[in-house]
């Protein structure tokens, strides 16, 4: 019964004026989204990570080559995979990946980690930054 009630909340909210998120406000052709597609195609690196479920998951819709997943902060010290509605295997990546940061708590941790590990800013604009760097989270047990 609880699951049914929880699954009904979002549709009910969208029929009222209390809309917690509006897809109409997301611009799939924004400058940063165009930059992400361009960087993915030029580097061949298709995995991109960052804070905020809505920011990251929507990127999966902009191009078939973009594989985006959310990272969240843990104890204000490091980031961990947020596997809710993400493909678990996307957190088992080796080598360099991309990061999309703005000004959130986890974004600040991501940027700090990338600076300490020689990450490179590939784009810095009003909508955020795109970084190239190593995997900065501890890989989950399911990756073994």
Task: Label each region the model flagged.
Residues 1-16:
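Signature aromatic-anchored transmembrane alpha helix within multi-pass, membrane-resident enzymes
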Residues 18-23:
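Surface-exposed cleft-lining segments at the edges of enzyme active sites
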Residues 24-41:
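A short, well-structured juxtamembrane/interface segment
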Residues 42-76:
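Short periplasmic/luminal acceptor-recognition loop of GT-C membrane glycosyltransferases, typified by
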Residues 44-51, 93-103:
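Short hydrophobic beta-strand segments
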Residues 61, 91-94:
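Extracellular/periplasmic catalytic domains that process cell-envelope and extracellular macromolecules
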Residues 77-90:
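Alpha-helical scaffolding within the catalytic cores
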Residues 83, 96-144:
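Aromatic/acidic, Gly/Pro-rich catalytic loop(s) in extracytoplasmic/lumenal soluble domains
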